[in-house]
């Protein structure tokens, strides 16, 4: 059974990667602008003063304009840094320098605060390949965010950022997979 779920996840991830790859630039730009508006709305609605997010890659729903807005508003933004042991360190982002980690993921160059720094935020924005209508999140397969969220004693609201067609009825899941409290898509905010 675990192999069957793993195969289902692999197939779905491949399909989603291909869909993202062939999305026309003008569609992506419009989606990113709408996502930024909705992330700002969510942050304002929750009165967030400190959040954890991630720097989106070119094929992901865009978070960079939102992060720039948050920094400009004086909201503390922590960004992840992947570690070889499967955990995430966190570092504050000031909108300036960034580099790339060993997995090709963008990361801030500021002081590394360690894995428990995320416990100080009041909102967490995570990437996802897909999320189902019960809030089950399927990531890209490395398990970093599942480990982080699963280890938090008092987890603040967690929202995944996805494209509209990535909110589905069900996603294949395993015991370690973590649910999110909602999603932000180009069409809006959906809470579960």
Cite the ranges covered by each PLM segment.
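Short glycine-rich anion-binding loops that position phosphate/pyrophosphate groups of nucleotides
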Residues: 57-59, 129-133
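Surface-exposed, charge/polar-rich loops and edge strands
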Residues: 1-7, 11, 18-25, 109-110, ...
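Short, charged low-complexity linear motifs
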Residues: 35, 126-131
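Glycine-rich, N-terminal phosphate-binding loop of Rossmann-like dinucleotide-binding domains
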Residues: 55, 128, 187
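N-terminal active-site beta-alpha-beta segment that forms phosphate/nucleotide-binding
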Residues: 1-120
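Short polar/charged helix/loop
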Residues: 141
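Short capping loops/turns at secondary-structure boundaries
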Residues: 114, 137-138
């Amino acid at each position: 059974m675990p192999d069957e779920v793993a195969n289902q996840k692999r197939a779905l991830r491949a399909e989603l990667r291909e869909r993202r790859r062939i999305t026309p630039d003008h569609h992506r730009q419009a989606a990113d602008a709408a996502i930024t508006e909705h992330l700002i709305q969510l942050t304002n609605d929750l009165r967030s003063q400190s959040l954890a997010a991630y720097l989106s890659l070119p094929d992901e729903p865009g978070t960079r304009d939102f992060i720039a807005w948050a920094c400009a508003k004086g909201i503390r933004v922590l960004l992840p840094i992947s570690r070889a042991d499967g955990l995430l360190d966190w570092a504050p982002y000031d909108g300036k320098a960034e580099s790339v980690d060993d997995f090709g993921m963008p990361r801030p160059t500021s002081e590394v605060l360690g894995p428990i720094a995320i416990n100080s935020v009041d909102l967490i924005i995570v990437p996802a390949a897909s999320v189902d209508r019960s809030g089950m999140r399927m990531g890209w397969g490395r398990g970093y965010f599942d480990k982080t969220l699963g280890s938090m004693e008092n987890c603040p609201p967690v929202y995944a950022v996805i494209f509209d067609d990535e909110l589905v009825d069900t996603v294949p899941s395993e015991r370690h997979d973590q649910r999110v409290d909602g999603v932000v898509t180009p069409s809006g905010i959906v809470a579960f």
